[in-house]
Amino acid sequence: MGQKVHPRGFRLGLSADWQAKWFNEKNYKEWLLEDEEIRKIIKNKYYHAGISEIYVERPDAERINITVKTARPGIIIGRKGSEITSLREELERKFNRRVVINIEEIKTPELDAQLVAESIASRIEKRASYKVAMKRAIMNAMRKGAQGIKVMVAGRLGGAEIARREWYLRGRLPLQKIKAIIDYGTATAWTKYGTIGIKVWIYKGDADI
């Protein structure tokens, strides 16, 4: 049986970057748990801001630099920077370190696999047809310039008694080509029949390596 490699891990250092940019042998466990808690706090607090990725960098033991990639930066920044100041102060109190937060705007959310997966999950939770949600996401991505996209959903689709999976593929998706720029995202839709998992792959071309 074929073993599947994570599309992001396969391309780290080439067309994908590490989300944690630090190494500390002594405090590794503590810092790793802190990173996960930081991501959870930000994602839960600004779920509707369209957050794709959160990068954590630690120049030293007393500082944490956080970069948030979002489709709606205004929600996180707030009026005159009130929201981002409140978030920074909350994180500094919790982790007792100096925190710097940078916001990066995602210009084309239709080409961000994580945001596409979350939008499909949101539509399914609102009882929209999963097929319509998948096809609309594919159509929008291809219109914005994607060279290929694959969307897979799995679970009790449409309230069926037996769980199954369905997927749609448009264009090319060279998963084995290491220089291919392939964005990957996952999300979970919570329905009254149970959870439905969503996976999205978007092929954006090849990296110059």
Swiss-Prot record:
GO CC list:
cytosolic small ribosomal subunit
All copies of domain KH type-2, residue ranges: 38-107
* Any matching Pfam family: KH_2
Q: Where does this protein have coiled-coil stretches?
A: none
> Which biological process annotations from GO are given for this protein?
translation
Q: Does Disulfide bond appear among the keywords? A: no
Keywords, ordered alphabetically:
Ribonucleoprotein, Ribosomal protein, RNA-binding, rRNA-binding
Q: Which InterPro entries does its entry note?
A: KH_dom (IPR004087), KH_dom-like_a/b (IPR015946), KH_dom_type_2 (IPR004044), KH_sf_prok-type (IPR009019), Ribosomal_S3_C_sf (IPR036419), Ribosomal_uS3_bac-typ (IPR005704), Ribosomal_uS3_C (IPR001351), Ribosomal_uS3_CS (IPR018280)
Q: Does the keyword Transferase apply?
A: no
The UniProt subunit note reads as follows: Part of the 30S ribosomal subunit. Forms a tight complex with proteins S10 and S14.
The Swiss-Prot or TrEMBL record describes its family as follows: Belongs to the universal ribosomal protein uS3 family.
- List, alphabetically, the HAMAP family matched: Ribosomal_uS3_B (MF_01309_B)
Record protein name field: Small ribosomal subunit protein uS3
Which organism encodes this protein? Thermotoga maritima (strain ATCC 43589 / DSM 3109 / JCM 10099 / NBRC 100826 / MSB8)
Source organism phylogeny = Bacteria, Thermotogati, Thermotogota, Thermotogae, Thermotogales
